[in-house]
């Protein structure tokens, strides 16, 4: 029974982690706090993992292309919406951070890291931040769940103790009771 409860709680917390990570990406990386303008789950998924998004990196010489080269190649190719899907949208909270997008586009990184820059800007930074925010949200939810379950257990324990005290608090002797 304990194993089942543990697995259920683990699955629930994993769903909470995914939910918080999605909210992080939908709000901060894609734009608006307005619930009607939130990115839909498939939009978030397609932005990172669709065939077009994956082809975009592989067509730009994969890991050998720097972020700057990739964005220039994409501009030359004239993508349909003119948006480099490795960077936050203009209305997002990340775009408002001074120097964040410039750092991603013109990253001054050591040579061995520079060859992975397209993957760093497209996957590692946003998905890593989403995972960390999801983890923080999950820890907060887990903390409150533990508080609630402890208070319920404490209340049950106190009720049981009170029932036992009432049972033995009778004026009759124990022999007559049995």
UniProtKB/Swiss-Prot annotation:
Protein known as: Uncharacterized protein MG319
Key words of the record: Cell membrane, Membrane, Transmembrane, Transmembrane helix
Region (Disordered): 155-178
NCBIfam families for this protein: MPN454_MG319
Topological type in the membrane: Multi-pass membrane protein
Stretch forming the signal peptide: none
Listed transmembrane segments: 10-30, 124-144
InterPro entries assigned: MPN454_MG319 (IPR054989)
Compositionally skewed regions (Basic and acidic residues) per UniProt: 160-172
One term under GO cellular component: plasma membrane
Superkingdom of source: Bacteria
Subcellular location: Cell membrane
